[in-house]
Amino acid sequence: MIDHQALRLFQFCDSQFPTGAFSHSFGLETYIQRGTVHDEESFKEWLRLFLSEQLTYADGLAIRLVYEALNQNDPEKILHLDRMLFVQNMPRETRTGTKQMGTRMVKLANELYDSEWIQWYEAQYNEKNAKLHPAICFTMLGHFLGIDIEMIIDYYLYQNVSALTQNAVRAIPLGQTAGQRVVTDMITFMKTTRDHIFELAESEFGITAPGLEINQMEHENVNVRIFIS
C-alpha cells in the first residue's frame, strides 16, 4: 500500500521542483571544465565524493540533529545549526545558492502545508535570526508529515543525486540513459551514506574535503558557465 505521506515529501525531491537546484552544480562545473569529470564513470566518482563528504558531514548530519531537536522542542538548537550550516559553507556562490534554495523551499512548504515549525523558521528569517537551509526545511516537513528520520535522509540524498545528475547530463554532457544508470548505481551508496550519518558524533559536524571547497570557490573564475555555483 502506498504511503501517501511519504509521497508528499517525495514531491520535494523532484529535480524540477522550483527551488532553483537546476541552476547549481556545487563545484561540479569546475571539475568538468578542467576535464577531471568528463564521462559517466568520472561523474559517479565525483558524486560519491560529494555525498560522502559535504552531504554527510553538513546536510546529512544536520538533518539528524534537527530531527532530534524537533522531538525535544529545542528551537535554539535549530537556530544554532542554521548558523553553523551558513558560516561553515565557505565558497560564496555555494553559500548564497544554498540560502536561495532554502528560502524558496520554505516559502513553497508554507504555501502547501500548515507546519508550525516551518512557519516559525520563516518568521526567524524575517526577523534576521535565521538564514534558511533546505536540509532544515526538508527535515521539518518530513517531521510534520510523520516520516521517520531514515526515510527523510534517504529522500534528501536522492533529491541531491537526482538534481546533480540532471545537471551533469546537461553539462558533460551525458545521455539520459547514462544519467539514469548513475542514479541506479548510486542507490546502494546512498544507503551506505545514510548509515554513516548515524555513526557520526556531533563534534564531526562541518568536516569537508578541501578539494571540493576549493573547486567551488574557483567556480567564480571559470571562463564559460551554465550554473550559478
From Swiss-Prot:
Keywords: Chaperone, Cytoplasm, Nickel insertion. InterPro entries: UreF (IPR002639), UreF_sf (IPR038277). GO terms for cellular component: cytoplasm. It comes from the Bacteria. Signal peptide: none annotated. It is found in: Cytoplasm. Pfam families: UreF (PF01730). GO terms for molecular function: nickel cation binding. HAMAP family: UreF. Belongs to the UreF family. UreD, UreF and UreG form a complex that acts as a GTP-hydrolysis-dependent molecular chaperone, activating the urease apoprotein by helping to assemble the nickel containing metallocenter of UreC. The UreE protein probably delivers the nickel. Required for maturation of urease via the functional incorporation of the urease nickel metallocenter. This is Urease accessory protein UreF. It comes from Staphylococcus carnosus (strain TM300).
